[in-house]
Amino acid sequence: MTAIDLSSYAGLTAMVLLTINILVGLLISVRYSPVRSWPHRQIPVFDIHNWTAYIALALVGLHPTILLFSATAKFRWFDILWPLGSPGQRLYNCFGACAFYLLLVVVITSYLRRRIGRPLWKLLHYLAYGVAALVYVHGTLIDPNLKNEPTDFLDGEKVLVELCGLLVIAAIIVRIRYGYSRAAARAQPGTSHAWFLDTRRVNSHTPALAAAD
C-alpha cells in the first residue's frame, strides 16, 4: 500500500464521518430524541455528533499530510497549506484545503460558543454545509492516483462519495420541508412534539457541526 493509497483512505473515511455528522446534526436541529422514539435504547447523539467532527477534522488534516511521504506525489508543505502551487489538479486541491479551513473554523467556534454568543455561533455553524459541499466536489472530481486522469464517476470510491452527497442533499430537503410543516403546526393548538429533544437540553450542549436550527 502506497502513501497515496493511505491518503485516499483517510480522505474517504473523513468524508463518511462528515456525512454521519451532518445527518446527526440535522436530527439534533429538529430536537429528535432517540430515547423517546426507542424507549429501550439510549443513543448518545451529541457524543456521536461531536466525535465524528473531531475525528473527521484530524483525518482531513492527515489526508494531504501523508502525501509528503510519497515520491510520486511530489507535494511540499506549502502545497498542502496553499494548493495553488501544488503539482497538479490545483483547483480540486483548493476545494479540499478550503474544506479543512472551514471545518477548523466550525469546530473552534463551537468550543467558543458561549463566548461569541449563540447568534454568531449559529451563523458560523452553517459553514458546515459549505464544508460538506467542498468535500463532495473534491472527492468526486480529483484523481485518487494524482495522475490528472479523467474522472470515472462509476469508480467505487467515486460512487461512495456521490451517494453520501445525495444522501445529505435529500436529508437537507427533508429538513427544510419539515421546518415549514413545523411552523404551520405551531399555529395549531394541541400539537404534540413528544419525539423531539427538550430545547433546554439542546442548548446545554455544544455540538461540533451542522446542528444549528
State where each predicted segment sits.
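Membrane-embedded alpha-helical bundles that constitute the cytochrome b-like, heme-associated redox core
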Residues: 1-213
